[in-house]
Amino acid sequence: MKTKPIFTAIGSKGSGKTTFLRRIGQILFGKKFDVTSVANDCKDLETLITNNYYVVIDNLDNPPKTLNDALARIATGQIIKKRKLFTTNQELEFEVKCYVALTSRTPQFTRDDVADRLICIYLERFGLFKDENNLCKVVMDKRDEILSYTI
């Protein structure tokens, strides 16, 4: 799929945004999957989006402008072109193959091409908290069963 939606979990602290998206990743890719964050310069984001099939970027309450640009490239399916190191005129191309999910308490995605591709889920704060390690164990124990329903 060339263009991709961007799944976004929005809610207050303690609403399970990160836990929910982490579980999706663990169902798809196993127990070692985890969410990530991006630095203000977003230098490592291109590496993430060209080497993974699913990336969860956590706590995007004040995303840098460069992140909005990167999200637009992801959503529209652009190819990332770079000059090959130590060469003058050789170019490398990297396909953006991942789907991106975001978490935010107060989303600030103002670019219309990004906002149009967001699939937002709004979560409320839990009244009763459950231990995330136990939730992970339950999901991992039932992973095969969960995946069999998706096929």
List each model region and its residues:
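Conserved nucleotide-state-sensing and coupling region of NTP-binding domains
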Residues: 6, 61-62, 91-92
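Conserved RecA-like P-loop NTPase ATPase core
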Residues: 24, 58, 71, 101, ...
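Conserved catalytic/switch belt of AAA+ P-loop NTPases
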Residues: 29, 68-92, 123
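P-loop NTPase catalytic core of nucleic-acid-dependent motor ATPases
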Residues: 1-51
